[in-house]
Amino acid sequence: MKICLLPGDGIGLEIVDAAVEVLDAAAKKFGFEIEYDKQLIGGCAIDATGVPLPEATIASAKAADAVLLGAVGGPKWDNVAPDIRPEKGLLGIRKALGLYCNLRPMTVSKFTAHLSPLKAERAEGADLLIVRELTGGIYFGEHTEAHLNADGIEEASDIELYTRPEVERIARFAFEAAKKRRGKVTSVDKANVLGSSRMWRKIVAEMQAKDYPEVELNNFYVDNCAMQLVLNPKQFDVILTNNIFGDILSDEASTIAGSIGLLPSASLGDGTGMYEPIHGSAPDIAGQGIANPLATILSVAMMLRYSLNQNEAADAMEAAVDAVMEQGYRTPDLYAEGLKNVSTSEMGHLVAQELLK
């Protein structure tokens, strides 16, 4: 199996290296082979090639069975032209691979409930999956930069556009995921204001009635969903949402977990999938060996499950992370008195060794 490695910027190299050690351990234990191809993306690609997404990176990603991404961006590239910012590399590879579905699981365990800004009894046991449409909507609609209109008034615009096929394919992902979980989908929109949301709600309801009657469907306005995530996160199973709402809600949900250093994500389409932690490149701690690699390791577990057809290995990797947490090992972002402080590479090694037991 071929994996395209895109460490990217900041802490990306450290966390990807730790995750690769764990993946190698899984391959050894479960009897499969991994071939790696490391490429550039983001700021490091700008420095080396002048663009955030070189053609060689696209070719490698398309030829791979899966892509593992670290993180992109940093203040070093804040003032480059908008069309070559590091984040353009991320958007570009999503488009090149046809990745239209972003999966973000969020769980709060007994080991992390005390980290949540919510009361532990409110947060512990939360287990939800955000299914976000990734390549449509306002981020990919027609844009006009600030300019003077015919009346001499400065204006700018961004178009929110969805088609029926785009809504149907992401909704199907959500319904299928719910069938394997607790059988409940919460579809999020702003149908009281937006025409695109009214179409979204209509299509999702039609699909539930026709193809998924066994799945419970609820519709929430996005503002109510944002509030309910804080008031009662345990009520949610699968949250289905468009691109911009999903971007915001998934970041909100991540704060409930108490640490973005624990949260993985998958971006899927009809071909090669891409896996990455939800946190950023954290350039302020890059190279210090203190970054938390667990979100990247858990992203690899998602890779094993969704792209490499290695469900047993995925379950074992997640269990190894839980075991290491239960043994009291923590990177500095999660460290507290009475626990065992370890570095990025040490955490990766601990999980790998636990997996090999």
Which residues does each PLM region occupy?
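N-terminal glycine-rich phosphate/adenylate-binding segment common to multiple enzyme folds
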Residues: 47-157, 244-246
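N-terminal beta-loop-helix "entrance" segment that forms/cooperates
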Residues: 31-55, 227-229
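Glycine-rich phosphate/nucleotide-binding loop
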Residues: 43-46, 107, 229-329
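Glycine-rich phosphate/diphosphate-binding loop of Rossmann-like nucleotide-binding domains
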Residues: 4-21, 25-27, 150-223, 235
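Short acidic loop-to-helix transition motifs that present clustered carboxylates
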Residues: 111, 220-227
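Buried hydrophobic positions in well-ordered alpha/beta secondary-structure cores of metabolic enzymes
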Residues: 9-12, 65, 131, 174, ...
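Generic secondary-structure signature for well-ordered alpha-helical cores
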Residues: 24, 28-32, 63-66, 95-102, ...
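Glycine-rich phosphate/pyrophosphate-binding loop and the adjoining helix
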Residues: 135-136, 141-181, 185-187, 191-193, ...
